[in-house]
Amino acid sequence: PYYSVDNRFYSVINTKNSNDGYSYQLSAQLQKSFAFGLDLSASYTFGHSYSVNDGTSSVAYSCWKYNYAVDTNNPKLTYSGFDIPNRVMVNVNYTSPKYANGLLQSVLGLVYNGQNGMRYSLTMNESKDYNGDGYRGNSLLYIPTDEELAQMNFASEEARAKFGDFINSDKYCKFHKGQYAERNSNVGEWENRVDLHFAENIFYWKKRGSKIQLTLDVLNFANLLNKKWGTTYGSLYNLSVLKVSKVAVANGVATPTFDYNNPSIYPNNISSRWHMQVGCKITF
């Protein structure tokens, strides 16, 4: 049925909760401690997380509006944007014996975290709202077959060739021709990160174990050693592959002309940089 909308409101959206989402993780860990103060551990985690809407916006309307979908009113259960299929963690921690007549003690730790990059969706950068959902940039990409690709209208043959090369080289697209891409279909490249922790304990009241602890933490320590290490990548949740450059209408039939967007995944300039922090803690 059709209901009239009070003109005091921009949009009236009826949303409801869903219980379709779920996640699971499987982990294995090895640990070993040595009497001279060395502690080692290594773990591997495999898992997946699924959702129909990750709810990453501040209000329900934005969560509905910006959700990547073929039909915004009927989103499908797909990978969550927070899905991390594989993660490896290694911890190395050494605590020295007390020295300087029991006054000092040093602690050194390294933490390695390796994991798949963030998930992202393949989308179309539309020049207008063609599917009528009120937003121009949330439509998932249709992956044409070779025959369909040959029949599509492109701004140039170069754009057609580049789009075809993208489909055949993308790990997801080449196996899903003739289908719409799923939300969060693609996984970013493997990311490696090493963090360094150093602490110096100063025992100023030995009988009670009271101490002053000075700390130095270097986050993404590998990037401090080499600017090419510790890089993380992001695409702002989506990769816009195609855009509609124009639409011709003849006899009531709309025919779009497509252009290739030359999409790229770029390093995240903030999280890829090393950070350093110092601290002081007094216990008594």
Model region roles, listed by residue range:
Residues 49-52, 115-123, 221-228:
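Secretory-pathway/luminal and periplasmic proteins that interact with or process carbohydrate-rich
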Residues 12-17, 72-81, 89, 95-97, ...:
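Active-site rim elements
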Residues 56-67, 123-132, 229-239:
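Flexible, surface-exposed loop regions and adjacent strand-edge segments
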Residues 1-102, 108-117:
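Gram-negative outer-membrane beta-barrel transporters
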